[in-house]
UniProtKB/Swiss-Prot annotation:
Species this chain originates from: Arabidopsis thaliana (Mouse-ear cress)
Entry's Gene Ontology molecular function annotations: heme binding; iron ion binding; monooxygenase activity; oxidoreductase activity, acting on paired donors, with incorporation or reduction of molecular oxygen
Annotated transmembrane regions: 7-24
Enzyme Commission number: 1.14.-.-
Disruption phenotype: Deficient in arabidopyrones, but normal amounts of sinapate esters.
Protein name, as recorded: Cytochrome P450 84A4
Organism placement in taxonomy: Eukaryota, Viridiplantae, Streptophyta, Embryophyta, Tracheophyta
Cofactors demanded by this protein: heme
Tissue spec. comment: Expressed in seedlings, roots, stems and inflorescence nodes. Low or no expression in leaves, flowers, seeds and lignifying tissue.
Domain of life, source organism: Eukaryota
PANTHER family, per the entry: CYTOCHROME P450 84A1-RELATED
Localization in the cell: Membrane
CDD domains cross-referenced by the UniProt entry: CYP71-like
Bilayer topology annotation: Single-pass membrane protein
Length: 512
């Protein structure tokens, strides 16, 4: 009787599992994509110094649009063609919806408690909805007002330094930092003096480097993860400690403010206020078993500080870099600004932005050549297949937006700065549906702050180019401006841009 019962249970189970096992076997028989041959056990670890967006783009030109690398027992796949990118970001985006976990990511995001690096699932969907609603939606009008006001302050700062060399990197970081702080934390940053700005810059840039570096310790067995031949683990601990104190002070300030203003129902709230309120409600509803904790709040604050500050700042610096290398494009966009806005007014309004066609082309061309995140990080949630190649579960997949934006099969003269290419009615847009141009990603893991970031980018550049003519210091020529990049998850300029503003308006700049 026991044998019969066993058969009754096992036969349906085997009939159910057999097709899945057969499919798994068929997948395993498929080859991996081409790539450089690795050594036994360690794979391609000795090539790790080539694994930035530029080095991977070169390897993809040799091995194709889907490249396979092996680091220890881990598989890495690099996507550098629009067709493969479409498969990853659109057709099978549910399969590639997780984020890879590294020692740096795990430690700097409080164990994956943030939004940007947590895995896809119910928690991620819930947090993204809150994130967008609390900070990035047009209904959250305070976020958009803060952009206008902080841009106007930066214009006044530049106006007070006319004729003097300005560090554009610091100017852009100060602006984007204050926009982010106003939108998320309710007030401009407390790091307004020069020394604190330098300190804040160093922290953000170190985070970017750590998020983007390949760490040998990530690709050895867990019992050997204490090995730190590159010194990255020590840097990770120091970086988190430097930022952790600031984030905790932000939370403490909001908790104290709430106590002081407990009875003031009309008091304006910011993102942190709303996160803390949501956290308290979760505790009540779930009887102290909450789905959102203080680490989640700290992780999201880290996301906003890093993503909201650095990406906009770097984009502003890169667009001015390219404009200074291309005087004819500077003249053309300033002629457009003169025609649309007029030299008798210094404010560029939203109604003007809609008509600044060539300015938008310049911004898109800058994002094509210098995408905010040159490598989009994904991880597979299950085994899958792309173009006849096997991609196993748990693999790291990197979409090389830098390579996509310079693909000669998609772009004519791809290395040249040519904003006019976007005047073509069928030119790619920023909606994430043209996979040769996805600077903010596409699909469910695309950048949630894209709209606010683009608005800040566009408004800042419009004002800087409308109010001032920019020239190079010390007799430099346009050809002397370099485009060498520094290391990091983003693409900072290795040597900060320095430029000299002169007024081009017929009216005074008055900022209330």
């Amino acid at each position: 009787m026991l044998t019969l019962m066993t058969l009754i249970v096992l036969v349906p189970l085997l009939l159910f599992l057999f097709p899945h096992l057969l499919l798994r076997r068929q997948m395993l028989l498929k080859p991996y994509p081409p790539g450089p041959k690795g050594l036994p056990v360690i794979g391609n670890i000795l090539m790790m110094n080539q694994f930035n967006h530029r080095g991977l783009a070169k390897l993809s030109r040799i091995y194709g649009g889907l490249l396979h690398l092996r680091l220890g027992f881990s598989h890495i796949f690099v996507v550098s063609s629009p067709d493969i990118a479409r498969q990853v970001l659109q057709v099978q985006d549910h399969v590639f919806s997780n984020r890879p976990t590294t020692i740096a990511i795990r430690y700097l995001t409080y164990g994956g408690s943030d939004l940007a690096f947590c895995n896809y699932g119910p928690f991620w969907r819930r947090m993204r909805k809150l994130y967008v609603m609390m900070l990035f939606s047009r209904k959250r009008a305070e976020s958009w007002v803060s952009v206008d006001e902080e841009v106007h302050k930066s214009v006044r700062l530049v106006a007070s330094n006319v004729g003097k060399p300005l560090n554009i990197c610091k100017l852009a970081f100060s602006l984007s930092r204050d926009i982010t702080f106003r939108a998320a934390f309710g007030s401009s940053s407390s790091t307004s003096d020069e020394s604190r700005l330098d300190e804040f810059l160093e922290i953000i840039q170190e985070f970017s480097k750590l998020f983007g570096e390949f760490n040998v310790a990530d690709y050895v067995p867990s019992w050997l993860s204490w090995i730190d031949p590159q010194g990255i683990n020590g840097r990770v601990e120091k970086a988190r400690k430097s930022l952790d104190g600031f984030i905790e002070s932000v939370i403490d300030d909001h908790l104290h403010k709430k106590k002081r203003e407990h009875d003031n129902v009309d008091e304006e709230t910011d993102m942190v206020d709303q996160l803390l309120a949501f956290y308290e409600e979760e505790v009540k509803v779930n009887n102290s078993v909450t789905k959102i904790n203080l680490d989640n709040i700290k992780g999201i604050i880290m996301d906003v500080m890093f993503g909201g500050t650095e990406t906009v700042a770097l984009a502003i610096e890169w667009v001015l870099t390219e404009i200074l290398r291309s005087p004819e494009n500077m003249k053309r966009v300033q002629d457009e600004l003169t025609s649309v806005v007029g030299l008798d007014r210094w404010r560029v309004e939203d109604t003007h932005l809609e008509k600044l066609t060539f300015l938008k082309c310049i911004l898109k061309e800058t994002l094509r050549l210098h995408p905010p995140f040159p490598l989009l990080l994904h991880e597979t949630v299950k085994d899958t297949e792309i173009s006849g190649y096997f991609i196993p579960k748990g693999s790291r997949v990197m979409v090389n937006t830098y390579a996509l934006g310079r693909d000669p099969n998609s772009w004519s003269d791809p290395e040249s700065f040519n904003p006019g290419r976007f005047l073509n009615p069928i030119a790619p847009d920023l909606k994430g549906n043209n996979f040769e141009f996805v600077p903010f990603g596409s699909g469910r893991r695309s950048c949630p702050g894209m709209q606010l970031g683009l608005y800040a980018f566009e408004l800042a550049v419009a004002h800087l180019l409308h109010c001032f003519t920019w020239s190079l210091p010390d007799g430099m020529n346009p050809g002397d401006v370099d485009t060498v990049e520094g290391p990091g998850l983003t693409v900072p300029k290795a040597i900060p841009l320095v430029a000299v503003p002169t007024t081009r308006l017929l009216c005074p700049i008055v900022v209330s």
